[in-house]
Amino acid sequence: MKKVSNTTNVEYFDYKGLLDPLMANADQTKKNVILLTTGSFNPIHRMHLEILNIAYKHLLSSKEYNILCAFISPSADCYVKYKQPPLIPFELRCDMIQNAIGNFYQENKDKNGEKLKIYLNKWEGSHPYFIDFPDVIFEIQKQLDKLYGNITLLYVCGMDHYIKCAHGLGQNVIAIDRKPFKQGFGHDNLMEDHDRMIFLIRDDKSEPYSSTSIRDYYKKGDFENIKKSTFPDVFNMIIEFYDQNKNSFVKNFNYK
């Protein structure tokens, strides 16, 4: 892995303040893991958090792991602006992520069982240049090794991303296959290896939400499906931002 920054993760994220209490209460007979997902989150939708929850429940059921928490790492503006516009600025995307996490907790507060702790990690997106996900994984794992030495970072992604990119990591990956399932890429075709901590999970319950569909819904004036796709507080932020940036839709989507 290349060196991507002269700054450290610690300048953007208080690992010890967060993890010391979690490690103190962890069952030391189990493997300590932290989940990580990366992406544009332009904007964040329900599936971004749901894949973390699916991964969490899958690991929890094995009773072999302490799932300490999960990190969400949004990409820098310099990368996101070259994807489908309009670009939601980094700090606003971070605010949306925080609100999504808060709404996610509210919606699940009455459910029995343990809850996954989810935190925004701003290190990646705070840079003026793009940092690819393998380097994000490497840098965060390096900080965890330096501070603790016994925490494994597990990268959580969709099956599309796993097939295209993350399969090359070779270890420490949880891939979620959503409807419509990838033909020919099930558990029988891609090797699941618990020794190398590669987990392939088929999810047949979640809706196929996406950031692209949210932008398309706005273009069509379909606010009801935007509400279904994301969280209440995020919905209001999305509509306000898109209303203020309709020119981007006119230029790029022939907005009507």
Model region roles, listed by residue range:
Residues 1-256:
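Nucleotidyltransferase catalytic core that binds NTPs
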